[in-house]
Amino acid sequence: MTSFPASHGFGPRKRGYQMDLTNVQPVENKPAWISMKSPLEKEIANEYEALKVTERKEDTQDYNEPELHNSNDPTVDLYADTYATQAATESDSELEDALFSQLDEFDDTAYREQRLEMLKKEFARVEAAKEKGHMQFLTVENEREVMDFTLSSKKVVIHFYHPDFIRCKIIDSHLEKIAKVHWETKFIRIEAANAPFLVVKLGLKVLPAVLCYVNSQLVDKIIGFADLGNKDDFETSLLEFRLLKSSAIDRLKEESSSNKSIYHDELQNNQSDDSDFFE
């Protein structure tokens, strides 16, 4: 057997022969045999990932929000929505009195009492949701916040945007409207440049990108405007209906303001067929 000088490090047992050159290469350029893991290594890696998920869930316990279930009662849901959208302009006591007085019209005492109890619980859920940042379109600055919200909130809609892309601004204007009336869902946005890990992990190459999570699971991706008619002046209700199909919101709600984007007028004569590519 040929012997190699120890100082040269060329022997088959020497690290320099097999590892040094490949270690400096990007992972995707390494030979397949270097990327292969033994069953034990795979088991250790899986346990490590599970531990990280557990630790993250423990870290976000303080962020956990109350269950915001749909009451499945149209009357109660309507009053709760009214309470959520008007409480900012009317005193809570005046609004509650107005809503409760409408229930007094029912002759069935048992029915009225049942609905009053449901209303009180629904109002409490609305207040809890608002305290947790619902009914706002929040801008977050880092990926950790995005992951925390995704783990701690039952329903989350995330917009990955670029500040200079006009279509991202259009999506922002629609999501801001939707967020104000859908108190059951958290709406957030993050600049794509501030989320490099998530952009790569989620394979985002075109902006705007809207991702919907329910119970920490990705349920829908809306990339560009291809699924929104591929035009800039689509109505808010179109995006709202898409979110409903994904279960990212509970139900459609009436809007008092115009359904058109705030950019509708200036974009009527500036239609574009392409979304913006993010690199």
Curated annotation (Swiss-Prot):
Comp. bias (Basic and acidic residues): 56-70, 254-267
Keyword Lyase: no
GO cellular component: cytoplasm; cytosol; nucleus
Main location: cytoplasm
Keywords on record: Chaperone, Cytoplasm, Nucleus, Pheromone response, Phosphoprotein, Signal transduction inhibitor
Modified residues (Phosphoserine): S272, S275
Domain Thioredoxin: 137-248
Domain of life assignment: Eukaryota
Entries under Pfam families matching the protein: Thioredoxin (PF00085)
UniProt KW rRNA-binding keyword: no
Region Disordered, annotated ranges: 56-75, 254-279
Subcellular location: Cytoplasm; Nucleus
GO BP, one annotated term: response to pheromone
InterPro entries in the record: Thioredoxin-like_sf, Thioredoxin_domain
CDD domains tied to this protein: Phd_like_TxnDC9
Homology family: Belongs to the phosducin family.
Protein task: Inhibits early G-protein signaling events following pheromone stimulation. May help create heterodimerizable beta-tubulin by facilitating the efficient transfer of nascent beta-tubulin polypeptides to the folding apparatus.
Protein's name according to its UniProt entry: Thioredoxin domain-containing protein plp1
Protein source organism: Schizosaccharomyces pombe (strain 972 / ATCC 24843)
Gene: plp1
